[in-house]
Amino acid sequence: MKGLSLEKYVDNPVWTILVETVHKMILYPHHKAYIQREILNKHPDISFQDVALNLEISRGEALVILYELKKEKTE
């Protein structure tokens, strides 16, 4: 997640709404698992913009997923 402070998005007042919306998406758990298993192993510094482009998902979903995976990794 190269040079990108994902935390700056978390401070936005609509962050919780974005997270709630992404979690309601049917393919969210599958996208998250795929990103963790396939994409981050090969490209650990990929940006959420590149994830969104490569998987043809919304930037919001990519942002939430990368933030959650980064957070899980540090815990």
Regions found by a protein language model. Name each.
Residues M1-E75:
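Long, charge-rich, low-complexity intrinsically disordered regions
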